[in-house]
């Protein structure tokens, strides 16, 4: 099965989530997935050294809007992806129900604690999680 990872947080951008995603995905067969992510000044050199497909948008941040849904669906069709992995669950997970294939979300600790304090955000996160085929917990805290 092939899939598409859609994220704002991918190397060469530096950070904990970026490192986690890279460590997880670099261990997969390179022809089993592609990445759609945001731009970075050092992306050309990084992307050239990776054995899998990385496509970067022009927009500095991937946000849930109709154009993003179209972009993801087009890449799904072209690549032949069977499902999409969205990271983070909020806000990117909001595009999930509009995708042409099933979606999964990566759930981080902040996405559990912040919506817990904001009633509307809690409802939105609940909607995203209920629609997801699978939820990938990024650690023990969001898993519980």
Regions picked out by a protein language model, each given a short descriptive name:
Residues 86-92:
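Short His-centered aromatic/hydrophobic patch
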Residues 132-144:
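A short, active-site helix/loop in glycosyltransferases that binds the activated sugar's phosphate group
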């Amino acid at each position: 099965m092939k899939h598409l990872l859609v994220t704002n947080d991918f190397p060469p951008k530096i950070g904990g989530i970026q490192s986690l995603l890279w460590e997880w995905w670099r261990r997969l067969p390179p022809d089993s997935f592609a990445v759609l992510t945001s731009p970075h000044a050092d992306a050309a050199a990084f992307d050239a050294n990776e054995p899998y497909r990385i496509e970067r948008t022009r927009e500095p941040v991937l946000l849930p809007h109709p154009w993003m849904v179209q972009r993801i669906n087009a890449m799904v069709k072209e690549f032949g992806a069977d499902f999409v992995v969205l990271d983070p669950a909020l806000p990117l997970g909001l595009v999930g129900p509009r995708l042409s294939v099933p979606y999964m979300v990566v759930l981080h600790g902040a996405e559990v604690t912040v919506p817990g304090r904001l009633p509307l955000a809690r409802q939105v996160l609940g909607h995203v999680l209920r629609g997801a085929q699978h939820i990938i917990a990024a650690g023990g805290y969001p898993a519980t």
